[in-house]
């Protein structure tokens, strides 16, 4: 059953990125760098926190999560994703390492909150880290593959793959740290 879900997730990601690439070709759009915005550090952190909260909350609601669960996931996701983004920008951490630390943070926070919110840990952690899935990296990889810029495409795909692998590893490591029964093989 797990392999079926993995294949479905892969198909969804590929179809979404391919659709975005085709629309970009039709509309003559191409990926560009981010616009430089002059904000003090506190402003960046606050806006990233708010955007992360809204993104995770919206994702949770879109998949029919009850409001209390969506708020819990959004709170965890806002903290974890803001930490991830700040690690990349302020400390120049590799994006995959920052994703691992972000997912680890989300997993630890979910473990601390699970009894208070009354939902299983996985119900809170999955929506809280979906915002960390590297959609932009996948899009840039697919776009560059489509225009036959293979070296650039491989770079974006490799970065995306490392981040995608780091997310569940962060959650697993958090579970190992916080759940004594999960640490041992029976």
Language-model segments: residues:
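Transmembrane alpha-helical segments and their short flanking loops
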Residues: 121-122, 126-132, 136, 142-159, ...
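Short, small-residue-biased leader/transition segments that mark boundaries at the very start
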Residues: 2-5
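Membrane-helix interface "capping/anchor" motifs
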Residues: 61-72, 115-123
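A glycine- and small/hydrophobic-rich beta-loop-beta segment
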Residues: 29-48, 55-63
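Membrane-interface helix termini and inter-helical loops of multi-pass transporters
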Residues: 27-41, 144-155
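Structural signature of hydrophobic alpha-helical transmembrane segments
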Residues: 36-51, 92-104, 162
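Transmembrane alpha-helical segments of multi-pass membrane transport proteins and ion-pumping complexes
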Residues: 13-26, 49-61, 77-89, 103-115, ...
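Central hydrophobic cores of alpha-helical transmembrane segments
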Residues: 71-79, 125-131
């Amino acid at each position: 059953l797990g392999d079926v879900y993995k294949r479905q997730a892969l198909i969804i990601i590929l179809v979404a990125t391919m659709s975005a690439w085709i629309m970009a070709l039709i509309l003559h759009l191409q990926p560009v760098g981010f616009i430089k915005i002059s904000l003090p550090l506190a402003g960046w952190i606050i806006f990233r926190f708010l955007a992360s909260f809204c993104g995770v909350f919206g994702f949770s609601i879109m998949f029919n999560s009850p409001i209390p669960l969506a708020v819990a996931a959004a709170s965890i996701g806002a903290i974890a994703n803001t930490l991830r983004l700040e690690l990349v920008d302020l400390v120049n951490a590799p994006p995959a390492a920052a994703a691992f630390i972000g997912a680890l943070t989300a997993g630890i926070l979910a473990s601390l909150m699970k009894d208070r919110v009354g939902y299983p840990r996985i119900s809170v952690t999955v929506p809280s880290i979906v915002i960390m899935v590297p959609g932009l990296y996948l899009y840039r990889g697919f776009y560059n593959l489509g225009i036959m810029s293979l070296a650039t495409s491989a770079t974006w795909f490799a970065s995306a793959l490392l981040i995608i692998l780091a997310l569940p590893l962060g959650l697993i490591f958090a579970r190992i740290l916080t759940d004594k029964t999960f640490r041992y093989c029976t």
